[in-house]
């Protein structure tokens, strides 16, 4: 290392060194003029002193305080310090020459070069953050060299003593850093001094305002090889930056915003890293050390390098604190387990995936011993907090999502404490999700919650039948979840075989329809009817359906078919034609009821019924017409003379000359918010309404195979006629329009079955304007 003697900043030299220089001046001012050329250590005794005309060493003993201050590995090297003086001559004449200020500066430089730069790495490490010793040796916090066992990451440049005026404000430090970073970006090779930002002050600096956008971009420019030791980043914003091979030892990063900040191959030992709660995305630490660093409980440590911890005391923070060890890292804990602390520290399901549980678990698997030890310390803290079941209840899911998995299941202490927690969690799942769909499982749920539920059903096999709704959902998601492991799928299949063998289940599967048609599941295809749900009211009733059908009924779309299943009673198939889906779901299979009702409320056909059949004048008919929309077939028929006459009295005024009256047409447009819609949009809606009234007139609802209510046929045809007037383009062809019209009226020998007409029109609408059809046609008719 070259040191410019004239560039030493005297303010950085310890006072004891200044005193030493003063002492040297006093010893040499009497009669000697000298030129100081070097300072060196030696154990060699002086043979000669003050020989004029020759190089002569002058021996001075370093004060003990200086030796104690620098603490080199071998203190004997400071026992004697020799200053070589050239061309000493007698100057007893007047004007005796003292050592000049320039020579004093050179003595300072030489002393620092020998005793600081070359020998006292310990001092550099503790006081300035200079590089550790070569060969994988670093210096621990107790000033003892330690071998890192290959875990110490690449480090930033060592201390430079080149003189520069230190910036006086955070803004000046920011300007200096911007200049250095831009020079590096331009391809300039920076010196160690250029990259030395130790003791810098970046408080309240938003780095996105001082650096080009390329440094905040994904895979953008990198801040590489800088020394930020002993620096202050409090309240700064370093979000989206990438620091590589940088040193942050002894720096303060309190309340710093570091969303998506990357620290790679860096030394972040002895750092206060309590970043701001406004940090949205966790910072990442890749091949980075955090020895004795204080970390918030919401961090991702997946790339951290751990070393062996030593017996140092926990860090001191304002307001006090409670801490646990995670390897050689310190994790902050709450002083008391209050309700807010339980939620903030443990509930990652409520805090964007962040908790102390996830922080510990984020370490690589090779640190399983350290992870288990930290979790045991956490459990001890929770146990000592004497938390009630009510306090633990909101975080049961978060707790089992981590602690019910390896390696923590290897700990007897954790298993014993977690057992009751897992039992209460399972009971709550059974109570909550037996009658309603589970949330659509994401990766977290598939990998962390489903295996826990499988384990709970394995321990409590009776729950498979008593809570068939939940059990079948769990098996369904285990078999179809893309993020479920093969082990999870294998365990799910094995548990389902146990379920099928249960006396309440087995009578329903030997009918030549289940699974592979011989009573066994066929998991090779999602079309096989592998699932059998037991009625929540009657053990003799069961529903058999395929994987795809079960999935879509739990998470329906407007096109979902609600009758694509087998209904079993005492092992025999039962027709669903006369069964109302809503009643079936309400009574026997409530797991589908909420989804069915939610889809049903999006169907707006009933608004037209309320226009035609007001509850004040036609309350009974109104209820009959609406009730008929809840089933595929109705036992109520309206073909007797009294019914035909009553319907004619209601519908004839709406159809003067067989067409929709202008006033009634405007009522329809208003009810369906079509007043300002395009003619095509209006036509599509009228077409779908016509389809529904064709269904009313058919044998499936109010008609029979040989007769149907004329008023309903006429109204259906009038709706279709108006749709044709508005937009003929929505019809397949003019010939098809004429054919449908003839069928409604029985003209030209056309087949008059309106059930056929309704089906044909419905298929056309589903193909060309499905969203309109799905918003109108009753769900049971879809």
From Swiss-Prot:
GO BP, one annotated term: protein ubiquitination
Residue ranges, compositional bias (Low complexity): 157-171
Major localization listed first in the record, in broad terms: secreted
Recorded phenotype for the gene knockout or disruption: Mutants are significantly less enteropathogenic that the wild-type strain in intestinal ligated loops and are impaired in their ability to promote polymorphonuclear leukocytes movements across the model epithelial monolayer.
Gene Ontology CC entries for this record: extracellular region; host cell mitochondrion
Catalysed reactions listed for this entry: S-ubiquitinyl-[E2 ubiquitin-conjugating enzyme]-L-cysteine + [acceptor protein]-L-lysine = [E2 ubiquitin-conjugating enzyme]-L-cysteine + N(6)-ubiquitinyl-[acceptor protein]-L-lysine
Enzyme class: transferase
Annotated EC: 2.3.2.26
Keywords associated with the record: Host mitochondrion, Secreted, Transferase, Ubl conjugation, Ubl conjugation pathway, Virulence
Post-translational modification summary for this protein: Ubiquitinated in the presence of host E1 ubiquitin-activating enzyme, E2 ubiquitin-conjugating enzyme and ubiquitin.
Protein origin, superkingdom: Bacteria
Subcellular localization: Secreted; Host mitochondrion
Disordered: annotated span: 137-171
Alphabetized InterPro entries for the sequence: SopA-like_cat, SopA-like_catalytic_sf, SopA-like_central
Domain remarks in the Swiss-Prot or TrEMBL record: Amino acids 100 to 347 are sufficient to target SopA to the mitochondria.
Protein's job: Effector proteins function to alter host cell physiology and promote bacterial survival in host tissues. This protein is an E3 ubiquitin ligase that interferes with host's ubiquitination pathway. Required for inducing polymorphonuclear leukocytes migration across the intestinal epithelium.
Family: Belongs to the SopA E3 ligase family.
Name assigned to this protein: E3 ubiquitin-protein ligase SopA
Organism: Salmonella dublin
